[in-house]
Amino acid sequence: GLNSPSEKDLEQKAEEFIQQHHSSFVSLYLLDKYFVQKESPDFNKIKKLIEVMTGILQDKLYIEQLNEAISLSEKTGTGKYAPFFSLSNIKGEKITRSSEDLKKKNLLINFWASWGDSISNHQSNTELKEIYQKYKKNKHIAMLGISLDIDKQEWQDAIKRDTLNWEQVCDFGGLNSEVAKQYAIKQVPSNILLSADGKILAKNLKGEQLKKKIEEVVTSAEEKEKQDNKKKK
């Protein structure tokens, strides 16, 4: 796993190398491999390492892009308010966070695309369908699929083929679509869990972790509702 000593040792060695070789392109490679390509990158650490690098490397387009990616990822970190979106569903209706079926609920957004890796897609859809079956009548959580497809027909076919019965939206911009940039989505499938007041609770949880987190969130909303009802009486 990520926390096995070898991974930590490698990171430490990579960091030492970067600190000592301010203008080596190997430093860029190590920065990318050991610090950027992680499930939850430590952006403060990455920023510090970028500062260490000298002009030659700082001028690189990669560093510019990295700085941009860092600021986006920080904006979409856990605890931050989720960016606004307005996207069309299959019927052509505009769907936003405050649409009737989504407002005042926790919201699980899954980003996907029919062109994504079929094994990952299948695994992700199987999980999402189980969650949907369990909670579709629950008033405390809703689901939304945001597709990064480019072709309308392929998008619609995939929804039918994979029986994705929760609300689905798309703006056909692919990975360059505004919503993918705003939510700092680098790959599909990925997901984000939002609280009822629109804050980011978690990103890219999978399997049991995702199910457990949703259960926690829903249970706590139900408890709160009970308390509120008691107060009213």
Features from the language model and the residues they span:
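Signature tryptophan residues that serve as conserved aromatic anchors
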Residues: 112-115, 155, 166
